[in-house]
Amino acid sequence: MKIAWNEIKYQPKKFILIEILIVIMMFMVIFLSGLTNGLGRIIMAQIDTFGDVHYILSKDSEGVIPYSTLTSSELTEIEDLHLEEQTGLVIQRSTFMKEDEEGSQDVTFFAMDTYKNLTIKAEDGYVAANLSDNEVILDESYKAKGIHVGDTIKDKTSDILLKVVAFAKDAKYGHSSVAFISSKTLEEMRQKKNPNYTWQPQAIITSQAVTADDLSEQLMVSNKQQIINKIPGYTATNMILKTMTWVLLIASAAILGVFFYILALQKLKQFGVLKAIGMSMGQITRIQLSQVGILSVIGISIGLGLAMALMPFLPVSMPFYMRAEDNAVIS
């Protein structure tokens, strides 16, 4: 190790090119991994944020929340289970616009009858449980579109006005930003088109473990990962993006392997001298491996550091998310 480090220290020009290459390759792979995770999270981030809860849906929905329809009798059946910390959820696509302004924004409304039991990453210390009727918590990506706390937005389907009271981080679902509203607000919005509408959740979320044996044949229960996998487009998108990352990682490793091989060929005469003075082939091999290890650790550390340093400067609208476990595997 000492000999390997001394050679690097006293002949840095010999190793500078390969070190730069390692840094660039590491930065590229880490950055692509972050984009891959980010693109995956814009499909399922809010479901992931809710944590390890269970979702009770109608069986014909096949695990897709917006496709679920719970009848009054099924809701009564669920109530009879006396589940702990249960929350009703409705997911609805829509568009909205700022009051007195033109142009519309796509949005996915998450309407719930209570916000006490689920995690929402509201900013500035806002407590989601305090959300009142005709108020809305928007995903932070809307900040870049000129929307601020205190603004009023109008749902274009119902013309209902909603006051923005907070922003939330990682509030994404199905390639769309999420807006959180109360069940009463959704009821008012839908009654504009259907006066007879009353609140009827698509899914019941509970922290209590529920099995299929606890439910009738018309109902099903899914965990967090099962719900995520059933979000339209998630599985295919995630598989393609992960494959791209691994292809780049393997290609980078192959390129670096070629450079290290060329570096070893350039040192054949040096190896001969070392053998002549009594150094074994095993010792020479350990020196080379130590050198590769030192160069790799330095390059990986710099590349990872650059990627992490860039994170705070990326626009909120860019889907970028780094995970420690992915960084460890790539490194």
Language-model-detected regions and their locations in the chain:
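Peri-transmembrane interface segments
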Residues: D213-L256, F260-K269, V273-L274, T285-L289, ...
